[in-house]
Amino acid sequence: MESGPSSHLDWARSLEAVLSDRTALDLFQKWLMEYSLPQYLDLYFAIRAFERMTLEGKPEKNQLSKSIYCKFLSSRTGNCEAIPKHFKAPIGEKIRHGIDLEDRAFSHCSSFVVDFLRRQHEEFVRSDEFIEALNKVRLRPLFPKPTVILQMSSSTDSSSSHQNTIRKSGSSKRTATQLTAEALLKTKHDRHTKFGELKLEKMYPSARQPYVCNATTSHNDSAVSSSFSGDAPGAHRSNRLRHLREEQAHQNRDTATVPRVEKQQASSAADQPFDHATENGRRGFSMEITKKLLRHLDKVKMNEEMERRIDDIEECRYTTIDMVNGTEADVDMGGIDEDEELDDYLKMKMTDDSQKGSQNRSPKGPNSGEKEKDGVSKNATFSPAPPPPRDSPRGLISSHLHHHSIHHNTIRPPRRTSKEYPLDISLSRNQYPRHHQIDTNRSLMSQSMCVPGPSYSSASSTFSRDSFAPSPMLKGFAGAPGSSKSSQMYDSSGIGSMAPSAFSATSSLDYKEKRHRKSLPNHHSMMSNSLTTPRKHHKIGKSLSNLITLSYVGSDKIPVVTHVPYDGPMTLAEFKRHFALPTGGQQLFFKTDCEDGSAPFQLLLVRDEHTLLPVFEGRIAAEIR
């Protein structure tokens, strides 16, 4: 170590001062072995030795270069992995081919190592080991100087508050102080008042030569601090702060400040925290907090809206097709089947009408001559006998019309045009009574649509007040005109037994129609679609276990879900019809099991309208892109 008085202070200023001083170098190497990588320090001195041998022309330089490469730079045996490969590759090529290296062969590696050691030096001078070693060197001067000790008295006399005593050391060799627990307790007050806080003592251990200073602590630190401040009651002009500072500077001439190497980190204004001490800083902080809160509120509102839409979709368990088929009407009416309710009503009405005497008497029958002799001809009603079975519906219709041909003049003419009730029968239209025309139309229409006709579509609603009830037809031919539930519920052959009147039937139909119209959201659309869509006569409770979930996610990332009856595999056209999606312009990707098992699922693009869709986890899920 150099003999200069402040050589140890240069250790913190530069790396070169540490590398040129043996004491600092040993300390730096010890710190590297404990906290970092010491091999880069060895490489630095090995490169310096190679350069010196090259300048002196020694033949040992080739062997040294091989050793440096094998120990530090080789990709297999080297331990300096941080050096870039493009610095090490040219050196390895020359050594493998036996080419002598030039003087500056390791210059690039040397510059990289120096930069690395310089960064390590910045951390080293901040460590506790360096500060402790620096204090030890400071406490061992080569030429001891007289010590100045300021004895601080606890007496209340202000004139003797600061008394200086000078002691000269008789020998240059000092004995180490025994820091026992008792000695530390005795000097605790002096150490606290001299150095202020315990953090300072931890960073800088107490010196063997007491430092002359004045207690400049706050008024609230301790009770004894007031006796060392200029505001004490017994203080006078000679003990002012300026006088004490001058005395300290005069008595402590060899005091030097320990340099601190702080790395300056460039930071932008955006990285700086808000200055709450200024109005602008507080305003900026409040604006930033307001923006974050608004973004959070927007997210909360969006999540609530999404949950509300999902709940609405879950509540709507059936699609528009189910509503057209009458499922929603059954739900609104309490789950009562419409046909069963109508049948019960007709039975009750027919029972009431059969118990009353008929006010409308029909004309005389073909056998009225025999009954007039018995005196019963005035109240007799005409009831045609059932016709014999025929092979075709045309024979049944013609036979049925033949029995009623004598009453053709008593039937009201039809009020509707031929456009409303087109018939496919080749017989003449004016050969039929009105109720046979309408009943035949409804039966044929029901056959063409494969839908059973409603129970009130025959005798109970088609004949007028002055007409007769149709004759009961055979059960074997369900498609004959006039064959329905109500036509077989009563017997028209007895005296006093009458079918329901036209007025009662039409009034019950009007009541039922009004009630049914109120229960449906769109009566006109249902009536128009009922001619093309088969009507489902099933209870809702029976179909809940046979439902499948359909869903898709659109471009707005909002899922749309529906539950439909599952009757088998579904095509792409049926899937689009359930959601009323357009036929073209959109690509549907359906979830299916992953083929290679690398993902939970995969997306399958389906374009053909007749392709069967895959079922993934019990549902058919799609994404529109």
From Swiss-Prot:
The gene is pry-1. Gene3D superfamilies: 2.40.240.130, Regulator of G-protein Signalling 4, domain 2 (1.10.167.10). It comes from Caenorhabditis briggsae. Residues 544-625 form the DIX domain. It is found in: Cell membrane; Nucleus; Cytoplasm, Cell cortex. Residues 162-177, 218-229 have a biased composition (Polar residues). Interacts (via N-terminus) with apr-1 (via C-terminus). Interacts with bar-1 (via ARM repeats), gsk-3, and mig-5. It holds the Pfam family RGS. Residues 153-177, 218-237, 247-283, 350-397, 507-536 are annotated as: Disordered. GO terms for biological process: cell development; negative regulation of canonical Wnt signaling pathway; positive regulation of proteasomal ubiquitin-dependent protein catabolic process; Wnt signaling pathway. One of its GO terms (cellular component) is plasma membrane. The keyword Nucleus applies. This is Axin-like protein pry-1. Keywords: Cell membrane, Cytoplasm, Developmental protein, Membrane, Nucleus, Wnt signaling pathway. GO terms for molecular function: beta-catenin binding; molecular adaptor activity; protein kinase binding; ubiquitin protein ligase binding. SUPFAM superfamilies: Regulator of G-protein signaling, RGS (SSF48097), Ubiquitin-like (SSF54236). Works in parallel with axl-1 in negatively regulating bar-1 signaling in vulval precursor cells and Q neuroblasts. Inhibits Wnt signaling, which affects tissue specific expression of Hox genes, egl-5, lin-39 and mab-5. This in turn affects QR (postembryonic neuroblast) cell migration, vulval cell fate specification, and the development of sensory structures by the seam cell lineage. Has a role in alae V cell patterning, ray formation in the male tail and axon guidance. Does not affect B cell polarity. Residues 14-135 form the RGS domain. The lineage of its organism: Eukaryota, Metazoa, Ecdysozoa, Nematoda, Chromadorea. Residues 273-282 have a biased composition (Basic and acidic residues). InterPro entries: Axin-like (IPR043581), DIX (IPR001158), DIX_dom_sf (IPR038207), RGS (IPR016137), RGS_sf (IPR036305), RGS_subdomain_2 (IPR044926), Ubiquitin-like_domsf (IPR029071).
